C-alpha cells in the first residue's frame, strides 16, 4: 500500500516535471490594473514552472525510489 502511494506520487511528479509546454505568466496591461487573487490556472502554471527547476532533485528521487523498490518492496 505504501509502495503504491510512493510510486503514484513519483510518477505524478515526473509527469509534471517533463511537461514541455510554453507556460508564460500573464502580463499586466497597465499601471491602473488592481492586483487580483491568482486563479486556479495561475497556481497550476506556477507549480509546473517551479517543478522544472527541480529536475535534478526529481532525478535523484527516482533513483532513490528504484533502490527502495528493489530493496524494501521486492519479494
Swiss-Prot record:
Location(s) in or outside the cell: Membrane
An example Gene Ontology CC term for this record: membrane
Domain of life (superkingdom): Eukaryota
Annotated disulfide bonds: none
Topology feature Cytoplasmic, residues: 75
InterPro entries reported for this sequence: SMIM7
Extracellular-side segments: 18-53
Protein's membrane topology: Single-pass type I membrane protein
Signal peptide: 1-17
Keywords: Membrane, Signal, Transmembrane, Transmembrane helix
Keyword Transmembrane: yes
Ranges annotated as spanning the membrane: 54-74
PANTHER family linked: SMALL INTEGRAL MEMBRANE PROTEIN 7
Family: Belongs to the SMIM7 family.
The protein, known as: Small integral membrane protein 7
Native source species: Rattus norvegicus (Rat)
